[in-house]
Structures are given as structure tokens and as C-alpha cells.
């Protein structure tokens, strides 16, 4: 009998020890959460009432997990008093749809040549499929999102993008024909102002309207920068599939000013697809946007880490 009592007593002691250990883990976890909240609170107060334009790239969407996490982050921003305006891309998704339709697609200097048939597919994928997918995820995360494109209400007036390239044989600058690839020349901020004073989060597809009713395919980074300037946003945030501006040794550049950013482009430190992103940020800053950020949108809670922590998580240009 005494052996049974000893065993039961030992089991009780073990159970109490387990509870004690679990209790300590819970206390540590809650303490960490409290520290995070204390660090975030000053930033929440600082940015309440401010407008952030967030570009969510097609390459940053990854799988449904990345999109769901993005939606939750955006809803939280709205709930703490920040006004997020979402602009999305969709390059990989457009390419996939064109392949399914057996439509050939070519690029010149990183820009998709967009003929009349291609622009219809671009509009269908951007303003239809992707836009509504993002809207649905934000709504599922207890937010209120409305999807629009630049043609709606004349939000984005666009013109044909003019690009030239030097012919290697004749050394003459020749005009490139990119079809219905456009650039915004006017953004109507009044349309977005309607959403600012409500619970609604606007989700914008980068399609523009020409003066003659044409539909233009516009680079999403460019659209985000133009909208940020038009609404006097305090932040332009570009979410892509890279961590930010990187040095040749692989080190992340956490902070950049405009002068240094331009020098890094000139010296070739910033190259490839990062150049137009940084140039968009510079143009936005020169148009009185407060700060610009480039982040890896595939990282969970990247928006919250960048906005609400002192260390940040990507590259901030100021």
C-alpha cells in the first residue's frame, strides 16, 4: 500500500512540476507579447489618421498563406486608425493566364508588350481575378474592402508610355512600341477620400483610362507611387519577393536617403528589378510622401514589423 501511495505522490509532484513549468512558459510568452505591444503603442499613436499606400506585388503573394497574412496585417492597420490603400500587381498571374490561352508574350526592358488582345487579358486578371481575391481575403479577416481599378470613376488617367532605345548598329535612339502600356498623368484623390473617412479599405488594380477611352496596363509600383503622391501619404510601402535593397555581400540596407540611393543606382549596387522600385520611391519622396519602404511580402507579419518596431524589417528610404 505504501508503494502505491509513494507512486501517486510522485505522480502528483511531477504533475505540479509540469504545471509550474508550463506556467513559467505562459508568463514568459505573455511578457514577450506585452513588450511587443509596448513597443508598438507609440507608433500606433503616431500614425493614427495617416494614409499608407501599400503595393502588394504579384510575386509577393506566393501562396494563400502569404495573402491571408497580408490581409490580417492590413485589417489591423485599419483597426488602429491607419488608412491603408492597397495597390496590387499580378505579373506572374498574367503570364500564367496568357500561357493557358496560348497567347505569346514578350518583354522589352522588363515591360510586357501589350497589344489589344493582351490588354484584355491583363484587365481580366488584374481587375477581376486578383483584385477580387485580395478583397475576399481582407473581408474574411473581418475587414471591409472594396475592389476598384484605375478606370473606375476616372481614378487614374493614363497615357501611352514613351520609351526609346539606342539601336546598336545605327547608334540612333528609336521609339519602342509597347502597345497599351501606359503611365499615369493624373490621379483623382477625391475618389479615395471617400474611403478615408469610412471603414472601407480600397484595393486598386493598376489599370488606367486613356483620353480616348483606351485601357492601359500600368506598372503597379508606378501606380502606387502616383497614388501616394496624390493623397499625400505618409508612407509608400512596396511589398515584393526580396528583403529590400541589398549590398553585394548580401547585407540588407536598412536606411537610405535619396542622394545615396541615386549613387547606388549609378554605381550599379542597385540593379535589375530593384531600380524601378527605388526610382518610384524617390519620385514619391520628392512629391512630399513622408517615407518609402521596400519589404519582402512573403515574410509573415512583415508590415507590422516594419511599421511598429524600432529596428524595422526592410529598407526605408527617406
Segments from the language model and where they lie:
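Nucleotide/pyrophosphate-binding catalytic subdomain
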Residues: 1-298, 305, 309-311
Amino acid at each position: 500500500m505504501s508503494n502505491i501511495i509513494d507512486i501517486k505522490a510522485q505522480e502528483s509532484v511531477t504533475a505540479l512540476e509540469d504545471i509550474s513549468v508550463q506556467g513559467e512558459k505562459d508568463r514568459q510568452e505573455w511578457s514577450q507579447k506585452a513588450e511587443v505591444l509596448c513597443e508598438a503603442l507609440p507608433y500606433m499613436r503616431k500614425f493614427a489618421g495617416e494614409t499608407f499606400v501599400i503595393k502588394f506585388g504579384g510575386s509577393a503573394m506566393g501562396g494563400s498563406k502569404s495573402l491571408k497574412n497580408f490581409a490580417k496585417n492590413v485589417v489591423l492597420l485599419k483597426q488602429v486608425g491607419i488608412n491603408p490603400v492597397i495597390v496590387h500587381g499580378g505579373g506572374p498571374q498574367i503570364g500564367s493566364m496568357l500561357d493557358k490561352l496560348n497567347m505569346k508574350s514578350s518583354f522589352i526592358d522588363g515591360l510586357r508588350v501589350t497589344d489589344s488582345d493582351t490588354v484584355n487579358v491583363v484587365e481580366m486578371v488584374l481587375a477581376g481575378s486578383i483584385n477580387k481575391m485580395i478583397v475576399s481575403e481582407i473581408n474574411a479577416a473581418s475587414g471591409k474592402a472594396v475592389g476598384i481599378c484605375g478606370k473606375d470613376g476616372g481614378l487614374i488617367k493614363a497615357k501611352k508610355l514613351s520609351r526609346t532605345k539606342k539601336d546598336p548598329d545605327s547608334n540612333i535612339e528609336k521609339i519602342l512600341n509597347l502597345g497599351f502600356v501606359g503611365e499615369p498623368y493624373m490621379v483623382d484623390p477625391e475618389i479615395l477620400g471617400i474611403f478615408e473617412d469610412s471603414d472601407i479599405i480600397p484595393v486598386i488594380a493598376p489599370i488606367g483610362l486613356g483620353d480616348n477611352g483606351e485601357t492601359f496596363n500600368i506598372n503597379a509600383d508606378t501606380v502606387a507611387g502616383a497614388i501616394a503622391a496624390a493623397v499625400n501619404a505618409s508612407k509608400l510601402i512596396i511589398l515584393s519577393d526580396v528583403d529590400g535593397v541589398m549590398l553585394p555581400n548580401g547585407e540588407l540596407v536598412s536606411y537610405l536617403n535619396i542622394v545615396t540611393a541615386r549613387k547606388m543606382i549609378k554605381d550599379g549596387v542597385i540593379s535589375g528589378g530593384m531600380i524601378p522600385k527605388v526610382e518610384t520611391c524617390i519620385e514619391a519622396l520628392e512629391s512630399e510622401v513622408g517615407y518609402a519602404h521596400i519589404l519582402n511580402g512573403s515574410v509573415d507579419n512583415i508590415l507590422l514589423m516594419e511599421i511598429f518596431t524600432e529596428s524595422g524589417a526592410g529598407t526605408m528610404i527617406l
